[in-house]
Amino acid sequence: MVSFSYLLLACSAIGALAAPVESEDTSFNETALHEFAERGGTPSSTGWNNGYYYSFWTDGGGDVTYTNGAGGSYSVNWRNVGNFVGGKGWNPGSARTINYGGSFNPSGNGYLAVYGWTTNPLIEYYVVESYGTYNPSSGGTFKGTVNTDGGTYNIYTAVRYNAPSIEGTKTFTQYWSVRTSKRAGGTVTMANHFNAWSRLGMNLGTHNYQIVATEGYQSSGSSSITVY
C-alpha cells in the first residue's frame, strides 16, 4: 500500500496499503488517535465495524478524516494529503455481487474502486469505478475488455517490484479493470471480472480482504459511500 508504481508513476497507492487484521477489534489506538487529532487526521486502522470489514491507511501527510458509519457506510474528507486509502467490505473477498452508492468528489488524484488481495499467487486487484485527474488506463499492459453491469471495463496488468504488500515487501502483479464511464454507485459483479481475468490468463489465489475503497494521492476531496 504505497505507490501505484508502474501504473501510476506519480501516484502512491491503494496497493499494499493495509495488512490484514486477525482480530475483530473495532477501536482505534487511543494514543495514536490523540496524536492525529492534533493534526486533524485519523490514524491507520483495520478491523470490523457493524458487520463489515474496514481498512484505513494513511501516510500521515495532510489532513484526512475517515469515519465509519452505520452498516456498510463510511465517509472520507481530505485536504492536501500525501496518500491514503480506506473503505468497507469483506474479509475474505469472493466473486460476490457488490452493490454500493454514494458520492465521490476528488480534486486531483483519486480512485473509487473495489480493491482486494489474494495470496498464492500474491495479487493486488482493482475494479475502478471512478477516478480523478489520473486515468489508470494511461499505464500498465492492456489485456482486453469486459462488458458488465451496464458498462465497459478496460483490463490491464502491472508489476510492482519490492513493494509493500500484505505479505511484507514483495514483487507481485496488479490486476486492473477500469470502467470507461465513471460512476459512484451501482452493481459490480465481481464474478464477471474474475472470469474475464481468468480467460486472459490472469489467475487469482486465496482471497484476503475486499473493500469498496476511496483513495487519494496529493489531492483534496470528499467521499461518502455505502456498501450493501
From Swiss-Prot:
Where the protein is mainly located, per its record? secreted
**SUPFAM superfamilies reported for this sequence:** Concanavalin A-like lectins/glucanases
Give the superkingdom in one word. Eukaryota
Residues that carry a glycan: 29
Q: What is its EC number?
A: 3.2.1.8
Q: Which residues form the GH11 domain?
A: 40-228
Give the catalysed reaction(s), semicolon-separated: Endohydrolysis of (1->4)-beta-D-xylosidic linkages in xylans
Q: Which region is the signal sequence?
A: 1-18
According to its UniProt record, in which pathway does this protein act? Glycan degradation; xylan degradation
Q: Where in the cell is it found?
A: Secreted
Entry keywords, A to Z: Carbohydrate metabolism, Glycoprotein, Glycosidase, Hydrolase, Polysaccharide degradation, Secreted, Signal, Xylan degradation
| Single GO molecular function | endo-1,4-beta-xylanase activity
Q: Name one GO biological process term.
A: xylan catabolic process
Output the Gene Ontology cellular-component terms. extracellular region
Q: Which residues form the active site?
A: 124 (nucleophile), 215 (proton donor)
Concerning its family, UniProt says: Belongs to the glycosyl hydrolase 11 (cellulase G) family.
Q: What does this gene product do? A: Endo-1,4-beta-xylanase involved in the hydrolysis of xylan, a major structural heterogeneous polysaccharide found in plant biomass representing the second most abundant polysaccharide in the biosphere, after cellulose.
Which PANTHER family did the record assign? ENDO-1,4-BETA-XYLANASE A-RELATED
Query: What is this protein called in UniProt?
Result: Probable endo-1,4-beta-xylanase A
Which organism's genome codes for this protein? Answer: Neosartorya fischeri (strain ATCC 1020 / DSM 3700 / CBS 544.65 / FGSC A1164 / JCM 1740 / NRRL 181 / WB 181) (Aspergillus fischerianus)
Q: Which gene encodes it?
A: xlnA
